[in-house]
């Protein structure tokens, strides 16, 4: 009987020890899988632990990183967008389209935040160096909010990300709630030295116009295309929009002067209702060509002010 009791006792001890080891292994497994997510490129990314050395390859993400309480050890150089004060002294690794890989690798990052369309060519090299990469896209308003959510998950500050997204929604609603119910017919033209294209819902200006409830007369031509597509003068005359928005690199005053010359030299322009009424607006590149990020509500208000100046008079 004593032997049976002793054997039973030993069995209990062994079982407890095994259970203890099993729990420990489970904890390690959980600890080794800090975060799993799908990034903007549709890649499944798993972080074994919370990243400590994050590098951003685009200045567009800096304000969003700051908003969720994140820190970085390296960043792309910003020529136009504002850099948060706390990040100005952070080492730079080159312009967004000309990243210095030697400088980047020298920072020994454990996570790189890359642009979906700008930096996908770097992903294989970074991953071969055991560096995690999350590709982000923040052209549309929904993409900005998704990026904020991802960054909140990366830094473990989901509550801050949620609050920031709620604030963005409120700021946009504060503008759209003041607008008349009518649907303005608009077109968004992107002008370069070689061509003029029209922009759709996946461009910044196109997304903003959608948020404001405007009707893009070029929507049919853009169906199934990317954010821009060529558009003929004949089609523009036929659609005859109420308002024309123009995006272009350069100073708005210079662009407006160039447009006046074009209008003068091409009678077809002068047949357009928008041109006759003086409703051609050049949109600032810092809000409509360069990703506005958390300034998206500012872009929404800017476009709304051009269309309905009386609604937003006296700084409303």
Where are the language model's segments positioned?
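Flexible loop/hinge segments that line or gate small-molecule binding clefts
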Residues: 83-86, 118-150, 154, 281
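Alpha-helical, coiled-coil/dimerization segments enriched in small aliphatic residues
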Residues: 79-81, 198-227
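Extracytoplasmic ligand-binding site segments that recognize negatively charged/polar headgroups
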Residues: 119-121, 137-150, 185-208, 252-254
């Amino acid at each position: 009987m004593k032997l049976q009791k002793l054997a039973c006792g030993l069995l209990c001890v062994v079982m407890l020890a095994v259970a203890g080891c099993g729990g420990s292994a489970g904890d390690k497994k959980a600890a080794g899988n800090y975060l799993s997510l799908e990034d903007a490129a549709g890649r499944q990314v798993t972080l074994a632990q919370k990243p400590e050395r994050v590098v951003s390859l685009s200045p567009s993400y800096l304000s969003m990183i700051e908003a969720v309480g994140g820190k970085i050890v390296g960043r792309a150089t910003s020529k136009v967008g504002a850099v948060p004060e706390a990040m100005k002294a952070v080492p730079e690794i080159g312009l967004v389209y000309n990243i210095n890989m030697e400088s980047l690798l020298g920072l020994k990052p454990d996570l790189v935040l890359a642009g979906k369309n700008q930096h996908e060519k770097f992903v294989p090299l970074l991953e071969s160096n055991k560096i995690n990469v999350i590709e982000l896209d923040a052209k549309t308003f929904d993409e900005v909010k998704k990026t904020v959510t991802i960054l909140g998950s990366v830094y473990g500050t989901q509550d801050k990300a949620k609050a920031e997204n709620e604030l963005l929604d409120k700021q946009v609603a504060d503008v759209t709630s003041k607008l008349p119910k009518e649907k303005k017919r608009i077109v968004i033209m992107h002008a370069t030295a070689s061509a003029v294209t029209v922009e759709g819902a996946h461009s910044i200006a196109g997304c903003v116009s959608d948020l404001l409830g405007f009707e893009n007369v070029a929507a049919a031509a853009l169906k199934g295309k990317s954010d821009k597509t060529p558009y003929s003068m004949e089609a523009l005359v036929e659609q005859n929009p109420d308002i024309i928005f123009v995006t272009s690199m350069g100073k708005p005053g210079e662009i407006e002067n160039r447009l006046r010359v074009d209008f003068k030299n091409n009678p077809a322009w002068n047949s357009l209702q928008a041109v006759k009424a003086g409703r051609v607006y050049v949109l600032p590149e810092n809000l409509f060509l360069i990703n506005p990020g958390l300034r998206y509500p500012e872009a929404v208000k800017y476009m709304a002010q051009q269309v309905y100046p009386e609604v937003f008079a006296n700084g409303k």
